[in-house]
Amino acid sequence: KDLDFDIKVPGNYYKEVIEASYPALIEEEGTDYLVYGFLTKENQDTKYYLTLLILISALFHMDSSKIKNQINQEIDPDDFTARVGYGVRNAIILQAQKADAKKLDRYVEIIEDGFKEACQGINKESLKAAFSIFEYGQREQLISVMRGLTYFLMWQFDKPVFESFKIIDYLDELRDLIDTDYYENFIKENFIDNPTKLVYFAKPSSTYIANKQKDLDNYIAKLNENMTDESLTTIKENLKKLEIHQNKADTEEEKATIPVLNIKDVPVNVETTPREVIEDKFTYIYHDIDTAGLIYISLYFDIGHLNLDELRYLTLINDFMGSVDTESIPYTKIDDVLFQYLTSPNFSNSFINVNNEKIARLEKVSFTSTIDTAQKGLDLMADFMFNSKFDNQKRILELLRMKKSYFESGMYDQGHILAMNRANSHIDKATMIKDELGGIGSYLFLKDAINEARSDFDSFVGKIEAIYKKIFTNNLEINITASPTDFKQVKEFINGKFDNLASKQGEVEIGFTPRSYKEAILSNANVNYISKTANIEEFGKEFDGKLIVATSILSNPYLYELIRAKGGAYGAGITANRSGLLSTYSYRDPNILKTIDSFDSI
């Protein structure tokens, strides 16, 4: 039988601005969300979709973007983002986060004027850089273990199944179109002359959740008023059936319907990754693995000479490098150049438990390139490492507010992880450092840093510059994955580029005293993320692989049934790691005390 899978999406054009609210603890001025959106065309193909992604990157993501820079300067949001909304018919969503709704008209004007200017002649260097990001991504896709799933997810419903396998051909075609008017015409047809449009803003409301609860209570009260004895009896019977179902053990017949792997189908040997340690000017760890011509470079600098407060500021410096002016290039030009020579540039911290006593503290500098562009890519990364300028207060505040916005946007999706790390930070030194530099502790520090950069910029910059000069020393190890020929060349590039690094200063001990601690952190969410943790070493126990099996069983079915099936949380479980930390968690949980009782029942 033929089935009709066609799903129609109405092409609405909203002439009036749509106003809404969002939950907030405090109703502050300048914390509104501004949105400009429109739908893409119907029945789009892969070429159309790839063009959208390239243009989104070139027009809105690059630091050279005129639209982005004007919005940051005039609208002054905490963050400005552009994304494709997925569905049967995609949407382009442009959002200014934590801005003033009084500037909404100007926000719309900047976007629409930017479209008109771009369709007259888009910045070709931004276009080349955006395109280069996709080319690197496709090379990585060729060697990814997830490539099958990725190709499947790229398939658009009701389109040819093998359409996504033609992506390289489409990219070749789109590259050749950069120096034509294809992209300008695309902007005019799909952005400017688009028959759909939505302009929206949301203001903070401290009564949002209370009002929603009141609406729900009124709805339930109305249901109860109209409830018949017969309907009430049916509901009670269904609840009883649900309780019986939840508490009933599965029969052997029911268990047999669950797909399982036979134990003999599970490999018992771990595939060995090729690894060679080479002592040269620096220590190199080399992996001879097929990379489809890509070169993966990670430099690890020992930063054991930095204290905890300096490490906190280092997390800010990591966001500044590559996003502020250097001695040779303004930040508004960096992206246009950078992504033509490399992809995935990253400055970050890494902390490794060497043993129970020692934690290696490392600064990681990494990027991906090819042999044709690796030397230029290394030059650019070194420029960020040694020649960055931190004297632009407005730009520094933009980056700090963006960092805060990113954390706030993602905190509810990873609330259970933040809760576990925060709980463990009171009993484990490594997790304490992790929390202070990437968890709740880092968020609290970030808010203080924004105030410091705003009220006493000279003092703030003084700290940043002093720490910046101490980061990169000759205590360096390099991890490279590439072909043997490419590795040999890149090793020479690195030896030459980092020939004059300073010697590392003495090691600084970071103090820590474990303590039992109960803590509650208030958020705008109307659900909870709960964690209770312990270190098994305090009970004279050591980590054992059997503990992983035990936590798996305790997570599902035990905690799953108590906290999710019966308690209404989105998720719950317990984890264990090699440091001996046992961590329970619940995710988007409507309860608190009931969940803690469930943890205690273990």
Which residues does each PLM region occupy?
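His/Glu-based metal-binding/catalytic segments typifying zinc-dependent metallopeptidases
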Residues: 2-64, 139, 147-160, 224-322, ...
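Generic marker of residues within folded, mature protein domains
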Residues: 26, 84-86, 192, 287-289, ...
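M16 family metallopeptidases and their MPP-like homologs
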Residues: 30-42, 67-119, 123-176, 195-205, ...
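C-terminal regions of mature proteins
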Residues: 130-288, 417-511, 518-520
